């Protein structure tokens, strides 16, 4: 059986913390690597749940003569992927009021395939409760980021209310249990190597960023995975489903009882092979032949399975979009079905945005990316999170039309999911207005094609006459 007990609340690790001003030494790093190794038991368990390697496969074997089905339903993956698709199925939009800043953001995002990067960060955060991103420079001095799961990385914070990061460690173990990695501090990056029992510091280089280039993306303050609260329910569901399958096998292997006569092995063989019973007892004895009935607990089992299924989605707060009644729902009723998951997504929005601000702060801190006087431009970046769900465009259009009479056009356009970039849309609207204005005549009417041609012909004639007059002179 596994070491991690998901039901035990004490098994959920707390963030690593040290007093402010603590010196980062080899001993300190080794101490926290040892603590992190303990946390990896939980991480491995959660990834096993996501990959559908659940506890039902670790239950004791039954006797050989009993059916022993092991069925596991992929609830953890379904819950995670459904929520990530809802939260980040539509990529996060970033917008700044200055076009030069927008161009830098777009270039950085394109170079790093940021849509996939952020999707993986969200997925890992939903599985483990948090994930990490490391920023680095390539050989051409271009800034890059890569996601890292928490089995290979951790951050140590100070004990202040602000929880400022003191140092971060990224390390990997090879097949020979040797450890290689890097320690990141405010001022330097230190290579480490050794083994889990102890690592030593190697080469050092200056940290060129304005802060530790390791960013933590958290799902919630407790850093619990999105399906972690229903682990016990998932295990119970798998066990109940497996027992249900065992019962089906039991009924398929029902016993045939023959009373009132003696049945030899040869008789039993003929009954089995010929599927015919011609029985008579001595001296007119009463013979009874029937299958033994087993207790039927089907209704009880189905009630348990139905209850567990509903509780898994209710407690995880993720909508069961595979429900038959879900597809027939629309409008306000559909929004109510998404309400719990929407609340969860909004809470994740705030955590995710905080990490994104830290990412672009580090990006803008390098003069190779942004002039020093504009290093604070990251503070004005506007992040737009949109939910990936069925859209009623007619209702949105009506709401936007009504809102436009009360607010600015920009505010009204934000209601429309079909508009991905509001400032760009406003620019296109203005261009169309200018183009339309040019097609009006001085009295406010439109030129028709013949009028435009006549006007062009008249202008050409006047030009020719003026030219001829000048030549005659």
Where do the protein language model's features map onto the residues?
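C-terminal helix-loop subdomains that flank or include functional centers
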Residues: 277-283, 307-473
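Charged, alpha-helix-enriched surfaces in structured cytosolic catalytic cores
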Residues: 113-116, 303, 307, 407
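Amphipathic alpha-helix face/heptad-repeat signature
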Residues: 121-125, 233, 240, 301-304, ...
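Extended, regular secondary-structure scaffolds
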Residues: 119, 126-127, 132-223
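Structured loops at beta-to-helix junctions and adjacent beta-edge loops in soluble globular domains
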Residues: 136, 170-172, 240, 292-295, ...
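Extended, helix-rich architectural segments
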Residues: 1-144, 465-473
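Extended, charged amphipathic alpha-helical segments
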Residues: 200-336
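Short, charged/polar micro-motifs that form catalytic or ligand-binding hotspots
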Residues: 123, 227, 291-302, 338, ...
């Amino acid at each position: 059986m596994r070491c991690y007990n998901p039901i035990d609340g004490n098994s959920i690790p707390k963030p690593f913390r040290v007093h402010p001003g603590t010196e980062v030494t080899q001993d300190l790093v080794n101490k926290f690597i040892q603590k992190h190794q303990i946390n990896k038991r939980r991480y491995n368990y959660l990834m096993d749940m996501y990959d559908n390697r659940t506890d039902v496969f670790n239950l004791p074997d039954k006797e050989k003569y009993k059916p022993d089905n092991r069925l596991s339903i992929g609830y953890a993956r379904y819950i995670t992927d459904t929520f990530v698709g809802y939260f980040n199925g539509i990529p996060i939009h970033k917008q700044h009021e200055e076009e030069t800043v927008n161009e830098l953001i777009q270039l950085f995002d394109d170079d790093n395939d940021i849509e996939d990067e952020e999707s993986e960060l969200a997925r890992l955060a939903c599985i483990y409760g948090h994930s990490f991103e490391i920023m680095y420079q390539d050989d051409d001095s271009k800034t890059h980021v890569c996601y890292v799961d928490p089995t290979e990385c951790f951050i140590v914070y100070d004990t202040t209310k602000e929880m400022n990061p003191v140092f971060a460690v990224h390390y990997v173990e090879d097949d020979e249990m040797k450890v290689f990695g890097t320690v990141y501090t405010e001022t330097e990056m230190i290579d480490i190597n050794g083994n889990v029992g102890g690592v030593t510091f190697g080469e050092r280089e200056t940290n060129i960023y304005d802060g530790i280039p390791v960013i933590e993306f958290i799902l919630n303050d407790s850093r619990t995975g999105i399906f972690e609260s229903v682990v016990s329910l998932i295990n119970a569901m798998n066990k109940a489903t497996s027992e249900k399958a065992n019962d089906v096998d039991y009924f398929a292997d029902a016993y045939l009882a023959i009373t009132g006569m003696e049945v030899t092995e040869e008789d039993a063989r003929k009954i089995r092979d010929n599927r015919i019973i011609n029985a008579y007892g001595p001296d007119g004895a009463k013979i009874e032949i029937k299958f033994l009935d087993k207790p039927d607990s089907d209704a009880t089992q189905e009630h348990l399975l139905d209850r567990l299924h509903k509780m898994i989605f209710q407690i995880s707060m993720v909508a069961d979009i595979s429900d038959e009644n879900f597809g027939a729902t629309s409008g306000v009723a559909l929004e109510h079905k998404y309400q719990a998951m929407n609340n969860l997504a909004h809470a994740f929005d705030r955590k995710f945005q905080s990490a994104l601000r830290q990412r672009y702060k580090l990006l803008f801190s390098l003069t190779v990316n942004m002039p020093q006087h504009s290093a604070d431009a990251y503070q004005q970046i506007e992040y737009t999170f949109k939910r990936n769900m069925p859209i009623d465009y007619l209702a949105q259009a009506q709401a936007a039309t009504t809102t436009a009479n009360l607010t600015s056009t920009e505010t009204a356009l934000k209601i429309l999911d079909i508009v991905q970039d509001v400032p760009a849309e406003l620019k296109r609207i203005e261009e169309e207005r200018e183009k339309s204005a040019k097609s009006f005549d001085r009295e406010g009417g439109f030129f028709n094609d013949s009028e435009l041609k006549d006007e062009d012909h008249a202008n050409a004639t006047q030009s020719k006459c003026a030219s001829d007059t000048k030549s005659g002179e």
